Design a protein with these regions (language model features):
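Conserved catalytic motifs of ABC-family nucleotide-binding domains
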Residues: 101
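Conserved ABC ATPase "signature" region
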Residues: 8, 56-75
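Catalytic Walker B motif of ABC-type/P-loop ATPase nucleotide-binding domains
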Residues: 105-108
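Conserved ABC ATPase signature
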Residues: 80-84, 88
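Helical segment within the ABC ATPase nucleotide-binding domain
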Residues: 120-134
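ABC ATPase "signature
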Residues: 166-167
Length: 191
C-alpha cells in the first residue's frame, strides 16, 4: 500500500486524485514548460487550475514572488521558454513547482544537461527552498551521488529497481556492499 498524506492512493477517486495534486510540486528533468506561454504564464498555470479562490491579481503576485524566490530576473518573465537559457528554464520550472506551496516537492533529475556552474546553482536553489519551507518533504531523483549527498539528509540507492542501501549519507561512506562502494568511489570520493 502506498499512502500519501495518510491516503491510500490505490483507492482514490479521480476527484480525490485531482485534489491531491495541489499538494505536490514537481520540477521535471527538462522543466516541462509550455512552449507557447511566457515564463510568467507557466508559473501562473497551476494556480489557475487549482486555486479558483484567487483573483487574477493574487495569482500574478504569487507567480512574481515564486519567480523572484527562484532567482529569475524580472526582465525574463514575459519571454517564452525557448528564449531563455536552460538554467532559466529550470528556475521557471522550480517557481512553477513552488507556486501552490506544496507539501511534497519532487525533483526529477534537476541538473541533467546543465554545466557545473548551473548544476551548483540549481542544487543551491533546492537546498534554499527545502531549508526555507518547513514541513515540506523533498524527493530528489539523481544519478549525481555527490549532489545527493550534499542535498539529502536521507539517501536511498537503487540498482535495477531494488534498494541497495538507504540512510544518511555517512552510511554510504562506511558500506561494505561492493556495488555501493564502487558508486561512492566514482561519485563522491573522487570529488
Amino acid at each position: 500500500t502506498i499512502k500519501i498524506l495518510g491516503q491510500d492512493i490505490s483507492t482514490m477517486s479521480e476527484e480525490d486524485t485531482v485534489r491531491m495534486r495541489k499538494h505536490f510540486g514537481v520540477l521535471f528533468q527538462y522543466a516541462a514548460l509550455f512552449d507557447d506561454r511566457t515564463v510568467l504564464d507557466n508559473v501562473k498555470f497551476p494556480l489557475k487550475e487549482h486555486r479558483k479562490d484567487l483573483s487574477k491579481r493574487q495569482i500574478e503576485a504569487i507567480a512574481y514572488d515564486k519567480l523572484k524566490q527562484s532567482g529569475l530576473d524580472e526582465k525574463h518573465y514575459k519571454k517564452l521558454p525557448g528564449e531563455v537559457s536552460g538554467g532559466m528554464r529550470k528556475r521557471c520550472g522550480l517557481a512553477r513547482a513552488l507556486a501552490l506551496d506544496p507539501d511534497i516537492l519532487i525533483y526529477d533529475e534537476p541538473t541533467t544537461g546543465l554545466d557545473p556552474i548551473l548544476t551548483e546553482m540549481v542544487d543551491n536553489l533546492i537546498l534554499d527552498t527545502h531549508n526555507h519551507k518547513e514541513g515540506t518533504a523533498s524527493l530528489v531523483v539523481s544519478h549525481d551521488l555527490h549532489a545527493a549527498f550534499r542535498i539529502g539528509d536521507y539517501v536511498a540507492m537503487l540498482d535495477s529497481g531494488k534498494v541497495l542501501l538507504h540512510g544518511p549519507p555517512k552510511l554510504f561512506l562506511e558500506s561494505d556492499n561492493p556495488l555501493v562502494s564502487r558508486f561512492v568511489d566514482k561519485g563522491v570520493r573522487k570529488s
